[in-house]
A protein has these predicted regions:
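Small beta-barrel nucleic-acid-binding modules, primarily SNase/OB-fold domains
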Residues: 2, 6-7, 20-146
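Bacterial N-terminal signal peptides
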Residues: 10-19
């Protein structure tokens, strides 16, 4: 890559980091955001037109939970993943107020990790109580196929 492109990429990364860190300590009200859709129980895609351009479209992962994967290792995991996605989308669509808190980058820098509050209720508690997620602290994940 040319030096100019590298400089632009570094400048964009600094801008995104500064803008993101300015939001990280506060609740981010998602009520006017559009296009929210959950891929599975712990990953959602959002469009946030009120944020700076680099942050308007992003993938967010819910902090503190592990849910079955859509690209499952077994039929039971796939079945649970579909239920988790349905649960997540239903909860997000029904909420009048969606707020993100404790925003931070994941370890690869491609997704935002967040706590989500739906009408004041912590989403991860709701999906764990529904039996569609497990608490997760970053360690080794248990298989959903056993």
């Amino acid at each position: 890559m040319s030096t100019r492109i590298n400089t632009l990429l570094v400048a964009a990364a600094v801008f995104v980091t500064v803008a993101f860190n300015a939001l990280a300590d506060d609740f981010l009200n998602m009520r006017e955001f559009r296009g929210n859709v959950c891929y599975d129980g712990d990953t959602c895609y959002v469009i946030a037109p009120t944020l700076p351009e680099p942050l308007q479209k992003m993938s967010v992962r819910i902090l503190g939970i592990d849910t079955p994967e859509m690209r499952a290792e077994c039929a039971e995991e796939k079945k649970l993943a579909l239920k988790g996605r349905e649960f997540a989308n239903k909860m997000f669509r029904a909420a009048e107020k969606i707020e993100f808190a404790n925003l931070k980058w994941d370890k690869y820098g491609g997704r935002v990790l967040v706590d989500v509050y739906l009408d004041g209720k912590l989403y991860k508690d709701e999906i764990i109580n529904a039996g569609l997620a497990r608490p997760y602290d970053g360690g080794t994940k248990e298989s959903w196929c056993e």
